[in-house]
Amino acid sequence: MLDLFNKTSQVQGRISAWLASNNLPHRPLGFDYQGVETLQIKPEDWPSIAVALYVNGFNYLRCQCGYDVYPGGPLASVYYLTKVDDNVDQPEEVCIKIFVPRENPKIPSIFWVWKTADYQERETYDMLGIVYESHPNLKRILMPESWLGWPLRKDYITPDFYELQDAY
């Protein structure tokens, strides 16, 4: 599994400094091209950090998605959180990345913190097979229930027996 916690740390931003001051384990990954601070969180630490971020004002889950890091490698779940407040022209944002092994990809669901995670976690489950533990309705949302495998994994092979039926 991709373990970035033991490598040299990146530049620490404001949110990373706040998490560190509260003894919340994370690893800063720097900033994206828009200046959004990116942090890596371990799956087991995610529920407590999610609640801490919510209490600190990150009241909106703007986006949750997942991706296959590389063939045979770990899977990633990504969360973009935003502080939505009155009279703010430039809301504060943070990007959280959680890496899990593809053999047993489990992450605690944050549906109980941000309800907008409902369909987004289901879609990531449907496409990549990341299991969001304690999600109230984790089942396929885009693919038929009978679909085999996880279509967005880089090692996915399309089964021969699926056909387009009544597609027109």
Swiss-Prot record:
GO molecular function: NADH dehydrogenase (ubiquinone) activity; quinone binding
Keywords tagged on the record: Chloroplast, Membrane, NAD, NADP, Plastid, Plastoquinone, Quinone, Thylakoid, Translocase, Transport
EC number: 7.1.1.-
Entry membrane topology: Peripheral membrane protein
A biological process term (GO) from this entry: photosynthesis, light reaction
EC class of the enzyme, as a word: translocase
Pfam annotation, one family: Complex1_30kDa
SUPFAM superfamilies: Nqo5-like
Domain of life (superkingdom): Eukaryota
Keyword NADP included in the entry's annotation: yes
One GO CC term on file: chloroplast thylakoid membrane
Catalysed conversion reaction: a plastoquinone + NADH + (n+1) H(+)(in) = a plastoquinol + NAD(+) + n H(+)(out); a plastoquinone + NADPH + (n+1) H(+)(in) = a plastoquinol + NADP(+) + n H(+)(out)
Coiled coil: none
Subcellular location: Plastid, Chloroplast thylakoid membrane
Main function: NDH shuttles electrons from NAD(P)H:plastoquinone, via FMN and iron-sulfur (Fe-S) centers, to quinones in the photosynthetic chain and possibly in a chloroplast respiratory chain. The immediate electron acceptor for the enzyme in this species is believed to be plastoquinone. Couples the redox reaction to proton translocation, and thus conserves the redox energy in a proton gradient.
Protein family: Belongs to the complex I 30 kDa subunit family.
Complex and partners: NDH is composed of at least 16 different subunits, 5 of which are encoded in the nucleus.
Protein name, per record: NAD(P)H-quinone oxidoreductase subunit J, chloroplastic
Native source organism of the sequence: Chaetosphaeridium globosum (Charophycean green alga)
Lineage: Eukaryota, Viridiplantae, Streptophyta, Coleochaetophyceae, Coleochaetales
